[in-house]
Amino acid sequence: MKWSEVCVHTTQEAIEAVSNILHEAGASGVVIEDVEDFEMMSHREDNFGEIWDEKKRDEYPDSGVLVKAYLAESSDLTDTIKGIERDIQMLTKFGLTIGAGTVTLTQVDEEDWAHSWKQFYKPVKISRHLTVVPMWEEYTPQPDEKIIELDPGMAFGTGTHPTTVLCIQAIENYLQDNDRVVDVGTGSGVLAIAAAKLGAKDVFALDLDEVAVRSATDNVALNKVSQQVTVRQGDLMKELKEPVELIVANILAEVILLFVNDAYELTLPGGHFIASGIIGQKKEMVRDAMVAAGFTIVETTKLEDWVAIIAKREA
């Protein structure tokens, strides 16, 4: 079988939206190539992140990012590519900057694809105690290190996007043993898995997307946390009946605004709401909405162009 590599040249801001477009077109996973990752890792003072092969620096664009996906060649591939191009251009109507927004196509042999794509994925230390490891990698954790295994070939990626990293680090800082947690827009389920690994008693992982629900369910089983994590298909927080100690949402800023009042009502007094997926220039908009809902902002963290906002419902 022949495969085609679809490569989209876009911006950091549009990575998640472009990735979703590629998933909807039939891709089972995406590869993100961002030269700023090299720059960030070379200047970090902590030991978080992946070990990078500097020889690959010249393969990355000087500006913007490349989002790559692989589609099986078929008679309707031309129409599929036209649909991808159209949907990417439509993102500008939602206020996203897409940069070049170009789509290129390269043919790849199945044998080459079956082996070469795994080279992009290595263990990544996300926080003090959590490391994301591709399921095929042999990895021996340190005594205080917990492992999240993911299949990067599945939909919703690797769990190492800056917004995910910010969320996981905030969960590690604010989660208390035996807390109940809600993960809104769970995607791969990585935040729900992280909460379970860090001591949550019960975790409810919600997503409207059927593919996300399947992906999260598989990842929860892979990480052996099915007793703690319940994955449900649902519209934002409408499935919830009882308040919890911690709500997390790695989701677009505009979507956070839709349920921030519900988040306040479903956060126990003294509990926290962690919101990420927020591009820097939309930070104040989300902060203002959280405060208007009744939350107190306790911390804002930043990684690359993204921020996470941690808010508290006062006791």
Curated annotation (Swiss-Prot):
Molecular functions per Gene Ontology: protein-lysine N-methyltransferase activity
EC primary class: transferase
EC number, UniProt record: 2.1.1.-
GO biological process entries: methylation
Pfam families with a match to the protein in the record: PrmA
Subcellular location: Cytoplasm
PANTHER family membership: ELECTRON TRANSFER FLAVOPROTEIN BETA SUBUNIT LYSINE METHYLTRANSFERASE
HAMAP family for this protein: Methyltr_PrmA
Family, similarity comment: Belongs to the methyltransferase superfamily. PrmA family.
Name used for this protein in its record: Ribosomal protein L11 methyltransferase
Organism per entry: Exiguobacterium sibiricum (strain DSM 17290 / CCUG 55495 / CIP 109462 / JCM 13490 / 255-15)
Classification of source organism: Bacteria, Bacillati, Bacillota, Bacilli, Bacillales
Gene transcribed to yield this protein: prmA
